[in-house]
């Protein structure tokens, strides 16, 4: 006999969990659509050569790669952005530019499993392809904020940086191993300052003074300073080199655009330590954390990638986008008790006291559905205690009872499972009114 078990880092979803996830995905999809983003789908499995060039060395170690039955070198996608580059390169002539897309799907990384981190997880990506305008960058951040608010989250911060600022810092200290250094800097939250310092010594062979100066600069943060105060504080960096100058100027323009959108200044701050480990980012980058749950890591991250299609096409299309980590958000929202705890999406359970009443019960259920009320019929004629227990377990808000009197008069008795109150022999229209209002004082 096979012992039923799930691989480490993977998970099953019971009905309650699956319902919660579906509800969150529905909410963010509505936000994406409200900004004009359209859905696309790409395969879970790609040629390895499609995915590998833009994966950092750390992510390459985490990629699920193997030979398929035809001997082809294939891999499971580790994000939805690299497949997007392949997709746009194939179809850009018919898509029309600029192209705004969103995609929701599972991705795979063989990282260490821990709370809020899985080896298979769902990403919700939204991207703006084919424009260099910082208006696109501002809109992506606007969508990030709107999406989190749609999930009833208010206490979060989008930490923003620019890859040119990081490149400029490396240039200032004469560091040539930019990609390797930034990959290590990106681990600051995970392994701490001492851990980053040790890796820079070991892997990049930097001298202590260079490491000290580098770490001092990448720890520059806006914190409680106003936007104007912070830009005044870092103005001197513009004189160091063109990368720093360009990066800071872009952030100044971005902040002007976000200000014009009247987004609360408490929701976004500059943090020079934000590097984003993926090598394809070229401009503004950002990570979003929940202020009371920073240990979960980023729940939404992204940035600008102006050369993503270079591996697939002579036409080098620009892009900017972000990815919402829905699985981490489920962990957070569960801890904050902001999730629907029901194991059903049906609002009403219809219970029959006699098998003869099922025809009427099914007609009643269909009438409720036609009125927009999700309903199900308990499949057995039982004493009422059993359907009540079933409704309590699954989370139905109402039980409609069909006994002899209700059957003969074509009415129903209605019990509110929250308040325990019951009204007998109601007309369909009266019951519909009560169910629609969800009156707790029934």
UniProtKB/Swiss-Prot annotation:
PANTHER family: HISTIDINE--TRNA LIGASE (PTHR11476:SF7), HISTIDYL-TRNA SYNTHETASE (PTHR11476). Pfam families: HGTP_anticodon, tRNA-synt_His. Homodimer. PROSITE patterns: AA_TRNA_LIGASE_II. InterPro entries: aa-tRNA-synth_II, aa-tRNA-synth_II/BPL/LPL, Anticodon-bd, Anticodon-bd_dom_sf, His-tRNA-ligase, HisRS-like_core, HisRS/HisZ, HisRS_anticodon. The gene is hisS. GO terms for molecular function: ATP binding; histidine-tRNA ligase activity. It is an enzyme of class 6 (ligase). Disulfide bonds: none annotated. Transmembrane segments: none annotated. GO terms for biological process: histidyl-tRNA aminoacylation. The keyword Manganese does not apply. Its main location: cytoplasm. Keywords: Aminoacyl-tRNA synthetase, ATP-binding, Cytoplasm, Ligase, Nucleotide-binding, Protein biosynthesis. GO terms for cellular component: cytoplasm. HAMAP family: His_tRNA_synth. CDD domains: HisRS-like_core, HisRS_anticodon. This is Histidine--tRNA ligase. Its EC number is 6.1.1.21.
